[in-house]
Amino acid sequence: MDQHFQVRIRSVFSYAVRLVDMYTRGAPFRSSLSVRLANHPQVPVCKGDGWYIFSDLPDGIYTLTISSREYIDRSVSFSVITGRTSYTESVIYLHPSPAYPFRTGDSLIRGRIFVEDGSPTGGAYVQAVISYERDAPVRLAEDADKEATELIIASKKGQVDLADAFLLETPTCKGTIIRFASPPKGRVYPLTEPLSFAYPRGTVLLPLLETYCDDRGEFVVALPLFLEKTHARMKIEVRREEAAGFAELSIQAGTTQSIGTIQLNRPK
């Protein structure tokens, strides 16, 4: 008589990462997306909505590499420890590359970065700060004390996205880059780090946009959608090791603007 056996194979969860398109805040384009471990053959299971799951990894430290034609390459390290009671999950925001399929009418700033000898520089960090001529959409609704761990925000654009970064700055207070740690309770937003300085009620939260250059030294900054009817200027700062470059321009919503080239210079 034939005997039949049912075998169940159980996988042990190791690591999960959610990839998010920094521009759309949704799942990234997958046409050229590669999500792999450096020096390890396992391929993750894609669960949809940008989630990638690794299972049954031996204990150790791993490097996850993310590459795509549409996004700037990323890498992140994580560890696997057998018996860990808490799950290891991460959210990684992917910044659009110059090859990203933006739509007609999107507000874009494009440029190229060169070093002093005229050659392009890849991987340079690009930081763009938006300042308003009027009608700033996000402000402090109450005074913020030094060492404050949360802010009370007044926003004309609805709830502020946790992926957003801002610069707090006044003529008498040094600038501080802030990020929010978790969803707000009403208008109260917890900070990832306490404030280093105090800021008065009404201080504008200046949107801070970040990206990197590709291997050819090219970059693109996509403006937030809520800027469509706002008069604003943008200050761009580019850094690579000790070298830095700067540019400034008026924003024209609904257009693609080129600032040409920015040269990186080392301090003398």
Question: What is each residue range found by the language model?
Answer:
Residues M1-S14, V20-Y23, T85-A124, V129-V138, ...:
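Beta-strand-rich domain onsets/edges
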Residues G26-D56, R134-A136, L208-V220:
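Short, acidic Ser/Thr/Gly-rich low-complexity loop/linker segments typical of extracellular
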Residues C46, V80-S86, D143, S182-P184, ...:
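Short proline/glycine- and polar residue-rich coil/turn motifs
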Residues W51-D56, I152-A154, L191-T192, E218-L225, ...:
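Exposed aromatic-hydrophobic patches
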Residues P58-E70, G217, E228-E242:
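A short, solvent-exposed beta-strand micro-motif common in secreted/extracellular proteins
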Residues E70-V91, R240-T261:
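Structured interaction patches on ligand/partner-binding surfaces of diverse proteins
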Residues P98-A198:
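Autoprocessing Asn-cyclization modules and mimics
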